[in-house]
Regions:
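Catalytic domains of carbohydrate-active enzymes that cleave complex glycans
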Residues: 1-2, 7-38, 42, 46-65, ...
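Catalytic-core regions of glycoside hydrolase
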Residues: 1-163
Length: 256
């Protein structure tokens, strides 16, 4: 159940609205539901929030359809089951099965005011764990641009089992949930970023520049340019020179 009383929840939501934060926030009430009763609990939690703030956005992450009930194994049924309770549907890329048509199906299920996001975790490729190459880290956002997600979620950036001594969680793939490191282990009092995070940043910058390129020359032209380095989640360049050429081309066309 929610940790706040009704009065506390109402006060928090009113304060968020008054300070202009409510339209920037989303409520993450459940992680990766798989069963019918879990969807019902999401509806209950969402109803409680919407009682005091009908405009509040609730985000739900999921990587599969229900594992029970009449919609068993139907990924796209989640959009119908949670209609009204969720405004941001965030699918794990594992559920998309390297099939861009499934991304199109997700977008087609959206109703007015709803958004479709995606997330990577575990050993997804392209992704952010250590099994992805540096270009794979970058291609995470190339994929987002091509498949037209309106948001990207990553579950945690400092998911250590312990900090003293510094240890990752043994049940997770190497690098999953760890994008930054405490500086003490590396002789500094500042946070240290991973190379994987820096390459993801490059991809996020590419994404922003592709959007600017699209506004100037059209989406078809932007996709044609992206196609030089990225065709699908299982078919993208492994040569950094082509990634750099993409960046150079984007900058030249945006600024001329």
């Amino acid at each position: 159940s929610h940790g706040l009383s009704d009065d506390e929840l109402e006060i928090m939501l009113n304060k968020a609205r008054e300070t202009g934060l409510l339209n920037k926030a989303f409520f993450y009430v459940w992680d990766e539901p798989t069963k019918t009763n879990e969807y019902e609990q999401i509806k209950t939690l969402s109803d409680r929030i919407h009682r005091y703030a009908p405009e509040a956005k609730v985000l739900t992450t999921f990587y599969c359809g229900p594992t029970d009930g009449e919609h068993k194994d139907d990924l796209f049924a989640v959009f119908d089951i949670l209609n009204g309770a969720t405004s941001i549907y965030c699918t794990g890329v594992w559920a998309l099965q390297d099939n861009e048509n499934r991304s199109k199906q997700c977008k087609a299920k959206l109703k007015s005011g709803q958004e479709w996001w995606s997330y990577v975790c575990m050993s997804n490729t392209p992704g952010l764990a250590s099994n992805s190459t540096a270009i794979g880290n970058r291609a995470t956002m190339w994929r987002n641009y091509k498949e037209q997600n309106s948001g990207f979620l990553y579950w945690v950036v400092n998911g250590f089992a312990s900090v003293y001594p510094l240890r990752p969680r043994p049940e997770l793939p190497e690098g999953d949930g760890i994008l930054i490191y405490p500086g003490e282990s590396f002789g500094t009092n500042k946070i240290c970023t991973s190379v994987r995070l820096e390459r993801w940043r490059d991809g996020a910058e590419d994404y922003d520049m592709l959007v600017l390129y699209e506004k100037k020359l059209g989406r078809s032209a932007a996709l044609s340019l992206l196609n030089n380095v990225y065709k699908s989640p299982s078919n993208y360049t492994d040569q950094s020179k082509y990634a750099l050429a993409l960046r150079k081309n984007l900058i030249e066309n945006i600024t001329e």
